[in-house]
Regions:
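Short alpha-helical transmembrane segments in multi-pass integral membrane proteins
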Residues: 1-23, 83-150, 197-252, 308-373, ...
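N-terminal transmembrane alpha-helices
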Residues: 10-42, 46-50, 63-78, 82, ...
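Transmembrane helical elements of multi-pass membrane transporters/channels
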Residues: 21-40, 144, 178, 211-215, ...
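Transmembrane alpha-helix boundary and packing residues in multipass membrane permease domains
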Residues: 26, 30, 42, 81, ...
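Helix-terminus/linker motif at the lipid-water interface of multi-pass membrane proteins
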Residues: 31, 35-56, 125-132, 188-199, ...
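Short runs within selected transmembrane alpha-helices of multi-pass transporters and secretion channels
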Residues: 76, 145-163, 171-179, 204-219, ...
Length: 462
């Protein structure tokens, strides 16, 4: 059996400080991931020709981009938890097998999106718009993102492997390298600066995938050089049905949870399209702006999950309790700060994009109303990570389905009907998000109490 250190920081550091130590780099990493989406939008919206149409095109492409992220990160979460739990149990050989099978799955995932990028993009975009200019720009952008998506898919894996062993600072450095490259390349490739060809919307896509490939390269180097808890062996890449099943027992709810963001965004695009094209553009921009806050909660969740999973493997009730306590406190603080920031800077932030007066007002209204849901959204996100850590994948899935599908889209549709009948103003549509998050938070708390009794009280030691 592979030799495992008896004591390491995942086992002996107080959860209160360990969560900050691991969480801060992960938060930064996730916020930087949001940079990819918002930076592209900022630059294309200020293009000389058709800036607002270009922003609309990116909004239509966004659900599929999020699906790539969902499957990549969800698979990574499954590998992350399995590796972390195996190391906590002292089973290093199985941790190696889980990591190797993660590589195999990343190859399969990339192949699927490569095929979609070559043959399925136009059909998908065509379901959301009849505007020829928007259709062409959205297809150009999304095709590039899919064909070169190997950077995003494989980075998601190596990022989670670094996080699984407590080396989240390295994954953050890799994310920073890609984000900086993206920010630098965006204006150069979109506007044709420094002698570069003026690519327009295509330039935004090229800058994005180049940044992702750079992040992958750096993360892979860090993994090979510093992730000594995991042995990299080609034989571990050979697919093992049982290992893959275990990865997706954990990861599938995470994939569905992330994919539901795609479904929700796609659904909102269709629903809001019955009101006006400006509503779709405003929604797309507000959604990317709010990701800076929500992704911070996702980052902390990604620290909560391996810490709590490791404690679950140790059967340490105290460390599990501390994970729940401090995970909830830290997440609430993050979301409260995010709420305050959005309320204060909604106006100047939206003005950074080349929007018409109507679209900007709609975007400001969306930000101010939806930000009221941040505290409850944070509770839901944190609890989803906790559920995953203690074999509560189904509970995590239930919360995701409630907050991003079952509750929010029917409410949005009902409110849109009221708007189209001139019974209410457009602002009421945004209320669907806070209402859905509040109801989902109640469901989260109830499910946690039941799962805690089953998994923690009966199966762990003090």
């Amino acid at each position: 059996m592979k030799k495992i250190k008896e004591k390491d920081k995942m086992e002996i550091l107080p959860v209160k400080s360990l969560m900050l130590r691991m969480g801060v780099p992960m938060i930064l990493s996730m916020v930087l991931q949001a940079v990819y989406n918002i930076v592209d939008s900022a630059f294309v919206s200020n293009m000389e020709d058709n800036g607002e149409l270009a922003l609309n095109a990116l909004t239509l492409a966004f659900p599929l981009q999020m699906l790539i992220v969902a499957i990549g990160i969800g698979t990574g979460v499954g590998v992350n938890v399995l590796v972390s739990k195996s190391l906590g149990e002292g089973n290093g050989n199985y941790a190696d097998k889980a990591a190797g099978n993660g590589v195999f799955l990343a190859v399969v995932i990339y192949a699927a999106f490569l095929i979609f990028g070559l043959f399925g993009v136009k059909l998908y975009i065509g379901t959301q718009t009849a505007n020829g200019i928007v259709l062409e720009m959205a297809c150009d952008y999304l095709r590039i993102c899919c064909v070169y998506s190997f950077g995003l898919v494989f980075f998601s894996l190596y990022e989670k492997l670094l996080q699984a062993t407590g080396k989240s600072v390295f994954s953050t450095i890799a994310q920073i390298c890609g984000a900086v490259a993206n920010i630098i390349l965006d204006p150069i490739m979109i506007y044709g600066l420094l002698g570069c060809t003026k690519f327009g919307v295509k330039g935004a896509a090229y800058a994005t995938v180049i940044g992702q490939i750079i992040s992958l390269a750096v993360a892979f180097i860090f993994h090979v050089k510093f992730n000594k808890d995991i042995t990299n062996n080609v034989k571990n890449i050979k697919p093992a049905a049982n290992t893959i099943l275990n990865i997706y027992k954990i990861g599938l709810p995470a994939i569905i949870a992330q994919a539901l963001m795609s479904v929700m965004t796609y659904g909102f695009n269709l629903i809001l399209g019955t009101v006006s094209e400006a509503m779709v553009t405003a929604y797309g921009l507000y959604y990317k702006i709010q990701q800076f806050i929500l992704f911070a909660a996702f980052g902390l969740r990604d620290a909560i999950t391996p810490i709590m999973s490791y404690a679950f493997g140790m059967k340490s009730k105290k460390r599990i309790d501390d994970s729940i306590k401090f995970g909830s406190i830290y997440t609430t603080v993050i979301m409260f700060v995010g709420l305050a920031v959005i309320e204060i800077i909604a106006n100047p932030l939206s003005s950074a994009f080349g929007l018409s007066g109507e679209t900007q007002l709609l975007c400001i209204g969306a930000m101010r109303i939806v930000s009221a849901s941040f505290i409850f959204a944070g509770i839901n996100i944190a609890f989803q990570g906790m559920f995953q850590a203690i074999n509560g994948g189904m509970q995590s899935l239930i919360v995701s389905v409630c907050r991003q599908l079952v509750l929010v889209l029917p409410l949005a549709w009902i409110f849109t009907v009221l708007v189209n009948k001139s019974i209410c103003g457009e602002w009421i549509i945004w209320l669907s998000v806070p209402v859905a998050e509040i109801l989902s938070a109640v469901i989260s708390v109830v499910l946690m109490k039941k799962l805690y009794q089953k998994q923690i009280n009966n199966k762990t030691e003090a």
